[in-house]
């Protein structure tokens, strides 16, 4: 089968291999069969390995949904009664956690920092000291809206010193840059299959401390479908999801994980890094600037400032690139006009070099006409 290859420079879903795409073409199977349950058990264990977890302590719980379902699940499931959430917020995707808290009516503090900077650890420390009822601290590892990489190891240490559970959204970092759930002081991390693993959309997962999941059994029940303990318990008792899983998507995730381990994480990390460097090289050649300090960037997403040109039109540039096989994406900084270029997915330096050849021509054809 000849599948046209598209280069996705958006922050997910990412460009995938044909073998992952074709892994979805399998004989029909009832997801309650032991064969399928066995595959999901191995998948869960392998996801823990991706996060460098300890299988005697950590587990992975699968859910059907986009990555945002994980935020919903962790916040509504892991907060005890009469306790509070602290959201360490320096970006648009972290703000989703604030919105989840608002929708559930969860007591919370939205600790806002500039989207251009790292969170101030001393302010986090003081906030926890002043609010002993905070039981859960939440932030994002890689804030995809800007490309900034947050100091989760340091934040986790502070959270634990105050007896709080530390939950981190690793949707746009897990499997692409170094992460160790234990060494990074993280109790729960989360991701979706279509980003770092380069699988298909529709399957998400939470990796975390089993003892903390079991403790949450007696917490207030705020959701039926999106309850972490309920899904975990059903997996432990039956090997199955509580409700119908995305069967073909699970097969694609299995193939993607096989490819992840075959390549090896160090080689995969190195590829993402050289793609990121190629993006910066291309931006420099075009004279385009980025919004976040280079030393704070994740190595995966670059927020690019619009050029100082009244003729610049992002929509036209997007469409021009899209017609030539490349997808670029709008920025998420409300105060500044930006677009994003990402080093996610099954792409390499040659793809980026071809993209910037297109960008050089778009400057001539669209911007300067």
Predicted regions located by residue number:
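PLP-dependent enzyme catalytic core of the Aspartate aminotransferase-like
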Residues: 1, 338-369
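N-terminal "arm"/small-domain region of PLP-dependent enzymes with the aminotransferase-like
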Residues: 1-34
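Active-site C-terminal subdomain of aminotransferase-like
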Residues: 15-16, 194-280
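Conserved N-terminal alpha-helix of the aminotransferase class I/II PLP-enzyme fold
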Residues: 23-73, 92, 96-100
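Conserved PLP-anchoring active-site segment centered on the Schiff-base-forming lysine
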Residues: 79-95
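Active-site phosphate-binding strand-loop segment of PLP-dependent enzymes
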Residues: 119-175, 188
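Conserved active-site segment immediately N-terminal to the catalytic lysine
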Residues: 182-194
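Conserved PLP-binding catalytic core of the aspartate aminotransferase-like
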Residues: 289-320
